[in-house]
Amino acid sequence: MKSYEVNFDGLVGPTHNYGGLSYGNVASQSNSQQSSNPKEAALQGLQKMKALMDMGFVQGVLAPQERPDVAALRNLGFSGTDAQVIQQAAKHAMPLLVASCSASSMWVANAATVSPSADTADGRVHFTAANLNCKYHRSIEHPTTSRVLGAMFADQKHFAHHAALPAVAQFGDEGAANHTRFCRDYGEAGVEFFVYGRSAFDTRYPAPQKYPARQTLEASQAVARLHGLQDDGVVYAQQNPAVIDAGVFHNDVIAVGNGEVLFYHEDAFLNTEQMLGELHGKLGKLGGHFQSVCVPRAQVSVEDAVRSYLFNSQLLSRADGSMLLIVPEECRANERVWQYLQGLTASGGLIREVKVFDLKQSMQNGGGPACLRLRVALNETELAAVNPGVIMTAPLYDTLTQWVDKHYRDSLRETDLADPQLLLECRTALDELTQILKLGSVYPFQIN
């Protein structure tokens, strides 16, 4: 049976703004308070989805969250009508209003961790929504994330959904941004690779000093248990604390994997040789041949990697066995990074082609091509069981483009978030979107 790796990209929400909410994310912090363009952001994301579909990849779409999150503000003590809640928050606690309006759910690499059926004990695809407890504005996402994923992957014969881990620092979980999977074929058993920044309970593990480590070893282990993974199909690796302090807040900012290949920076991990040996050995027992592509610090510094988002790229398998790297425009703008990529594709290795996309609106908030997608490996039967409304087609692309043009503003500043009209605009748009994507009622305003 044929299997696919399907990329489900996050649709950028109507409140996309530069709130500077993510400490440890250099781009997010440095572009704080600038005027954003939600319409352009959403269209840039849709163009990437359509381009991958046109290249022959199966492409899906993941709906944004309801924002402003009035329920979250009510939980923090604001009351009255929805408009009054927003006005009170704007007057007395503007940072809370900004957080409740964040469109960060577009970065669906943080939505969940996904294990395909070939790896799990019960032969189903498993999803665990990420608690994202390190940042308040993201910690409020997982209830809606779970409902949206449940509406997309509803058939319990094929799909299993787990609630987010306990919302405490010891189980900080950032989802697929710290997880990848190596395999010979998407439909065969593989090795799941969990990357953590610190241990919550074992002080022998080093930790970053400047920025927080958002993923714990204990969270990764819990997800592996929930998904019914075997020990011989799992590798845990610690990210280098020094690169976290340099702005590498998720592993997908310093490494990307696909198939049998890990593309990573020389400084990405601790105990790199041991980690590579374990990956090689475990994948070898499953009939695969693990290969690594290391980018030397002498050619690309960590600073250049963070600035260009070289590793926050999509590594995709072509039908001929070669690989394609999808990178943001910022890679072409960085002379050292672009020179490295030109040499990489000319070397005759597995990565034969680089395609560049303009994702400036997302990039300025600290999210590149890899942040915008959640990978789900599915066999033909499972793909047929996915809600067809969320699979990208040419007609769906046209419909969503028209939907964005109709509902989204082309400029948004922090002061605009206090406008009660924005709430009505967003709810009207999302109500229409759930009909387009055939999701049913998934948003709080539709349920309560």
From Swiss-Prot:
The keyword Protein transport does not apply. The keyword Iron does not apply. GO terms for biological process: arginine catabolic process to glutamate; arginine catabolic process to succinate. InterPro entries: AstB_sf, SuccinylArg_d-Hdrlase_AstB. Its EC number is 3.5.3.23. Gene3D superfamilies: Succinylarginine dihydrolase (3.75.10.20). Catalyzes the hydrolysis of N(2)-succinylarginine into N(2)-succinylornithine, ammonia and CO(2). Belongs to the succinylarginine dihydrolase family. Homodimer. This is N-succinylarginine dihydrolase. It comes from Pseudomonas fluorescens (strain SBW25).
